[in-house]
Amino acid sequence: GEPLSVKIHEIEHPDILLWAVWCIQQYGKIVSLQKCVEKYGLLAKDIMMYLSTSSHPNLKVRENGLVYAQGKSKAVTWMNSTANGRPIVPRSGYIVEFNALWYNALKFSEEICQMVGRKEEEAHFAAMAVKAEQAFKDVFLNQYGYLFDYVDEKDQEQDWSVRPNMIFAVALDYSPLSLPEKKTVFDICTKELLTPKGLRSLSPKSGGYNPMYVGPQVQRDYAYHQGTAWPWLAGFYMEACLRLYKKSRVSFVERVLVGFEEEMFSHCVGTIPELFDGNPPYHARGAISFAMNVAEILRVVKLIEKYDI
């Protein structure tokens, strides 16, 4: 057949290629891993070779095996609100979801190379994954059982804020955490971040909590990722729940989904808005329809189907 032509947009952002590998991984669950590897395996492998050699201008692999991104002067994560040209949430250094995605991508690449008989590259990714697994725990896991949101070794900074980005280390197919560690992270997300409309972007117990997305633009910018609830994060939360507890928590996941049902009949009918206030009554805010939110709810509905209750 003809060579596969793929255009990935905005690859200058540090995490875009990691998400591209995740998308390929999800595609394999739909069509079979064999068909996925036949079509996209070489692309996934090439992406990971590019990243693993620190060729990306904004994502570098450090000596400890983790990836590092500079975000002090320019927002580089999905929490990208700015004021006066500077990030409001200056997430920089070792960023927790980047490294959860990185570890998952390394293990998936190892799996792909094993399937196609590329022994040398399989060993390369396997060795990197082993290194990253231990470093992830050393860098992110704190004595309270949750994960630092980011750690910037340059400024000797550990961000103790309880944020939802740690849920990816539980939800993804491959995790550097043990089962007890994953359960502790999940429990903290449940207790401090879960709302009927998604996960809060910041715990009410953390400094700077601002759950109401109201007021003039500058005021809303400061609240955007400081306590507002985001439905798309609930998708990964529910996936994490099913991954940990399987069939026994299907009814719980269904109850979480019910929280979005009424939104289908208000504002823009048949869809879900961008975000919600983090405190009751959880008013809808932002764009009246948000693709990431809709996609994640639909993905969880498909995840539930395989439990056949």
For each feature predicted by the language model, list its residue ranges.
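Charge-dense, low-complexity intrinsically disordered segments
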Residues: 34, 38, 89-92, 96, ...
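Aromatic-rich carbohydrate-recognition surfaces in CAZymes
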Residues: 1-70, 96-99, 103, 228-253, ...
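C-terminal non-catalytic interaction modules
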Residues: 270-273, 305-309
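Short, flexible helix-coil linker/hinge segments at the edges of structured domains or between repeats
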Residues: 63-86
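Catalytic cores of carbohydrate-active enzymes
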Residues: 49-68, 103-213, 255, 262-294
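Terminal accessory carbohydrate-recognition/targeting modules of carbohydrate-active enzymes
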Residues: 111, 119, 226, 243, ...
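Solvent-exposed loop and edge beta-strand segments that line ligand/cofactor-binding
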Residues: 3-17, 80, 84-100, 149-177, ...
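Amphipathic, soluble alpha/beta structural segments
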Residues: 119, 126, 135, 208-240
